Amino acid sequence: MLTPVVSYSTVREVKGPLIVIEKTRGVSYGEIGEVVGPDGEPRRVQVIEVGTDYAVAQVLGGTLGLPARGSTVRFYGKTLKIPVSEQLIGRILDGKGQPRDHMPLPPPEDFRDVNGEPLNPYSREYPEEPIETGISAIDGLYTLVRGQKLPIFSGTGLPHNLMAAQVVRQSTVRGSEEGFAVVFVGVGIKTEEALFFMDEFRKTGALRRAVAVLNLASDPVAERVLAPRVGLTIAEYLAWQLGYHVLVVITDMTNYCEGLRELSSGRGELPGRRGYPGYMYTDLATIYERAGKAHGRKGSVTQFPILTMPHDDITHPIPDLTGYITEGQLVLSRAMWGKGIYPPFDVIMSLSRLAKDAIGEGKTREDHKDVANTLIAAYSKALEIRNLATLVGERNLGWRERRYLRFADAFEQKFIKQGYYERRSFEETLDIGWDVLSILPEDELTNARPQITQKFYRRHVYESVQL
């Protein structure tokens, strides 16, 4: 139980989720406390701005029914810390780290600051071990790497929630003696989405190795900004203290940024691009940069954040700034979704900057780089030929061009498309890749090494294609 260091009855204003306290002395940025209104109900607060004789604090429990007159604020002289424990695995929490599953918190093994432990850049270890998600488009083309931060850029109405649940359920680390855990963070999600995730995790058994932090759209905006940090604090404890490889799935970071904008507006700050605060890049970096591996530590923290691009605009400040910080992006395509392809990846717009160092012999399979490079190059050429066919007609194309059209169809329908409950290993993904590539003549596969093509090319597939 924390003991108040100082109390103030000088609340000047309640403005949205914020309160302004006058005549303060010695109050620090990030310090926690509580505000008690005339009803006697305590609500946790955190200082987000300090002036010469005033402080601004965000009320984590919301300010509904809280008047300025008659309210008392008590500060504790400490920053916000949450109890952490290995027994949190299998639990569902809210955005403040409190139970949402109607069970008591387990005995804490430690208390950790929600702002995390800064990793010395010199101690960081380069990520080069893959995580198998069971989704061919990710594992085959843009492999997720332990310690990486790889976001999904989605749009309203696209199946990013299904993908988040599938990744939580299927992801694993092969050939590792350390444990593997998933921390799922729902930020500003609707009640029906929260019910979907909770039901899905329980039904499939994914919750047995996961911690779920669910912040609802109806929860206070201050909690929305806190939720990713709570999830990452739990992930860091599991990784750095207990040696787990932790995959952190966060959805939806757009809701986080909207909450950040709302808090900034409430503080009267000068807005930046499209009304978002000018420090949004720095703020996002404090979240994304908590991913990584460190020398001398067994565990790792991998981030898989999901955001919805407003109006499908990839130049919007949220995806734009996210792309600067993270190591690539996976873009979902509305056109692919319209054709009934799940997961609807935009292969050409997607990128994983670290994938090349986490695949190949001894990690996945010797032909992995060849398959990935050749599939992307061939599909890019096939899309150009598909556009040409709409102008001149398929019958006026040569036989090689028609093979590229067959390849593009097979690539989308057999390689990219897979069932929601279908899990593919690296080997299965690469085998499907060769089945699709073998539709093309062998001399077209110039992005693969000759010895690899000779070993894996399926001539019987080539001969069976009807033009």
From Swiss-Prot:
One Gene Ontology term from the biological process aspect of the record: proton motive force-driven plasma membrane ATP synthesis
Keywords for this protein: ATP synthesis, Cell membrane, Hydrogen ion transport, Ion transport, Membrane, Transport
Coiled-coil ranges (or none): none
Places the protein is found: Cell membrane
Pfam family, one: ATP-synt_ab_N
PANTHER family: V-TYPE PROTON ATPASE SUBUNIT B
Entry protein name: A-type ATP synthase subunit B
Source organism phylogeny: Archaea, Thermoproteota, Thermoprotei, Thermoproteales, Thermoproteaceae
Gene: atpB
